[in-house]
Design a protein with these regions (language model features):
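Positively charged n-region of N-terminal signal peptides that target proteins for export
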Residues: 1-6
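Bacterial N-terminal signal peptides
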Residues: 7-17
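Electrostatic cytochrome c docking/interface patches
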Residues: 15-31, 42, 46-51, 104, ...
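Sequence context surrounding c-type heme c attachment/ligation sites in exported
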Residues: 26-37, 54, 58-63
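The canonical Cys-X-X-Cys-His
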Residues: 35-42, 96
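Short acidic-aromatic loop segments in the C-terminal HATPase_c
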Residues: 37-40, 66, 73
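Short hydrophobic/aromatic segments of transmembrane alpha-helices and their interfaces
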Residues: 43-44, 64, 76
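Axial heme c-ligation environment in periplasmic c-type cytochrome domains
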Residues: 47-54, 69-104, 108
Length: 108
């Protein structure tokens, strides 16, 4: 009985982790429009001195946002990115990564 209970806990834990880490693309797009679009442009296409961030792997986007959230400087706009990333939760980072992975800018 203990083994069955243990396996159930492990299974639900794994499912929870995957559901959180998968990210919600729609929520990510909303958060992107709220916090990121002014510098990185429509669908993360990049603008002026701000890099293109769309089409990157989820692991890359997640790692970069977590690095900035932790206050670590990486590039020329690090102070701004640190300020923008510090309030992000793990779920918001996963959502942003899910959105940006497949975001495509379409010319109007």
């Amino acid at each position: 009985m203990r083994t069955l209970r243990f396996l159930a806990v492990v299974l639900f834990s794994v499912l929870f982790v995957f559901s959180v880490s998968a990210g919600d693309r729609v929520a990510g797009e909303a958060r992107y429009k709220q916090s990121c679009i002014n510098c990185h442009g429509m669908a993360g296409k990049g603008a002026a001195s701000y890099p293109k961030i769309s089409g990157k792997e989820v692991s890359y986007i997640t790692a970069m946002l977590e690095t900035y959230r932790d206050g670590i400087e990486v590039g020329p706009n690090s102070s701004l990115m640190i300020m923008m990333a510090q309030p992000l939760t793990d779920v918001e980072i996963a959502n942003l990564a899910a959105y940006l992975k497949d975001a495509v800018y379409q010319q109007p």
